[in-house]
Amino acid sequence: MSPNLSRLERKLGHSFKDQDLMILALTHRSFAGRNNERLEFLGDAILNFVAGEALFERFPQAREGQLSRLRARLVKGETLAVLARGFELGEYLRLGSGELKSGGFRRESILADALEALIGAIYLDAGMDAARERVLDWLSGELDGLTLIDTNKDPKTRLQEFLQSRACELPRYEVVDIQGEPHCRTFMVECQVALLNEKTLGQGGSRRIAEQVAAAAALIALGVENGND
């Protein structure tokens, strides 16, 4: 095994029995042959489960919507990319020549995806207990810094953080109607989210309020919140 990969194993805190799993987890789809997308899918599911389990135990009084918002904050791409940079993961990625030239080893989404793929690889290599231990160790700083105050953000911010945690495009807002006199207007705003087949609507006395209402409706439609949180 490459000494460099041995160094990465020490940083991750896991020594792979099956080195091919580790190499596959570091292989981007731009590289020829098999890639890490299936491992990323598996790792994403494990990450969300472990994070959800930890939050459930840590915040026994939190409501479902609050737990969902905390998890979205915990597993968003930005957080994972910061962890990946701490492991200097970009140095170990297998990328196609085009991605290398464009700086793909620094790109947030590629780093976050590779870290999720490594979680999936650790699970296949050593089981759920090992994967849980690594995830909780990596996220310990973020977990310790979370409070229920973090769930008191406005709907637009919560929606943006949820979508970022899924590596999705940010929502788009558009004013579709304005009614009433200049001193007493009502704005109608549409919110378009890539994960939803239909746009959500919001109405309010200002564009800002209407956008917040539309974002709240999108969170409910996505199943992130139930309208009672």
UniProtKB/Swiss-Prot annotation:
CDD domains: DSRM_RNAse_III_family, RIBOc. Gene3D superfamilies: 3.30.160.20, Ribonuclease III domain (1.10.1520.10). InterPro entries: dsRBD_dom, RNase_III, RNase_III_dom, RNase_III_sf. Its EC number is 3.1.26.3. Pfam families: dsrm (PF00035), Ribonucleas_3_3 (PF14622). It is found in: Cytoplasm. Its cofactor is Mg(2+). GO terms for molecular function: double-stranded RNA binding; metal ion binding; ribonuclease III activity; rRNA binding. SUPFAM superfamilies: dsRNA-binding domain-like, RNase III domain-like. Residues 5-127 form the RNase III domain. HAMAP family: RNase_III. Digests double-stranded RNA. Involved in the processing of primary rRNA transcript to yield the immediate precursors to the large and small rRNAs (23S and 16S). Processes some mRNAs, and tRNAs when they are encoded in the rRNA operon. Processes pre-crRNA and tracrRNA of type II CRISPR loci if present in the organism. This is Ribonuclease 3. It comes from Ectopseudomonas mendocina (strain ymp) (Pseudomonas mendocina).
